[in-house]
Amino acid sequence: MGFPLEKSEDEWKKELGPEKYRIMRQKGTEHPGAGRFTHQFPKQGVFVCAACKELLYKASTKFESHCGWPAFFDNLPGKVKRIEDNSYGMHRVEAVCANCGGHLGHIFKGEGYSNPTDERHCINSASLEFHNEATNDN
């Protein structure tokens, strides 16, 4: 599957380090509650892809879901690609960075959260960086 930013796995391994590589390139996950962004709720700013720095989520779309991972109800337009994921005997939708293909987490719909999309983007903190400064996209 092609993405605008492509690198060899050796390049990704070197740039990301072991934990981010495991999560972002090997589709791993963090332990629930272990991520640095799980309990942070900034009012402004953006969350970007930890691998390629692509803007992904406005801080204003982050919400408390009590699931153990950072949760967002929507991504910036065109920034997160949805891929059907039937691994581990489950039907889920994987969220990946539309620029580099890095694994972010999964997207769940119809869980009854009172947000504008009724979606929960359950995202690994290791897949994100936070930028507090305002941008044209937030």
Swiss-Prot record:
<dbReference type="Pfam" id="PF01641">
    <property type="entry name" value="SelR"/>
</dbReference>
<dbReference type="GO" id="GO:0034599">
    <property type="term" value="P:cellular response to oxidative stress"/>
</dbReference>
<dbReference type="InterPro" id="IPR028427">
    <property type="entry name" value="Met_Sox_Rdtase_MsrB"/>
</dbReference>
<dbReference type="GO" id="GO:0030091">
    <property type="term" value="P:protein repair"/>
</dbReference>
<dbReference type="GO" id="GO:0033743">
    <property type="term" value="F:peptide-methionine (R)-S-oxide reductase activity"/>
</dbReference>
<feature type="domain" description="MsrB">
    <location>
        <begin position="9"/>
        <end position="133"/>
    </location>
</feature>
<dbReference type="GO" id="GO:0005829">
    <property type="term" value="C:cytosol"/>
</dbReference>
<dbReference type="GO" id="GO:0005737">
    <property type="term" value="C:cytoplasm"/>
</dbReference>
<dbReference type="GO" id="GO:0005634">
    <property type="term" value="C:nucleus"/>
</dbReference>
<feature type="binding site">
    <location>
        <position position="49"/>
    </location>
    <ligand>
        <name>Zn(2+)</name>
    </ligand>
</feature>
<keyword id="KW-0539">Nucleus</keyword>
<feature type="active site" description="Nucleophile">
    <location>
        <position position="122"/>
    </location>
</feature>
<dbReference type="GO" id="GO:1990748">
    <property type="term" value="P:cellular detoxification"/>
</dbReference>
<keyword id="KW-0963">Cytoplasm</keyword>
<keyword id="KW-0862">Zinc</keyword>
<keyword id="KW-0560">Oxidoreductase</keyword>
<protein>
    <recommendedName>
        <fullName>Uncharacterized protein C216.04c</fullName>
    </recommendedName>
</protein>
<dbReference type="InterPro" id="IPR011057">
    <property type="entry name" value="Mss4-like_sf"/>
</dbReference>
<dbReference type="InterPro" id="IPR002579">
    <property type="entry name" value="Met_Sox_Rdtase_MsrB_dom"/>
</dbReference>
<feature type="binding site">
    <location>
        <position position="52"/>
    </location>
    <ligand>
        <name>Zn(2+)</name>
    </ligand>
</feature>
<feature type="binding site">
    <location>
        <position position="100"/>
    </location>
    <ligand>
        <name>Zn(2+)</name>
    </ligand>
</feature>
<feature type="binding site">
    <location>
        <position position="97"/>
    </location>
    <ligand>
        <name>Zn(2+)</name>
    </ligand>
</feature>
<keyword id="KW-0479">Metal-binding</keyword>
<comment type="similarity">
    <text>Belongs to the MsrB Met sulfoxide reductase family.</text>
</comment>
<dbReference type="GO" id="GO:0046872">
    <property type="term" value="F:metal ion binding"/>
</dbReference>
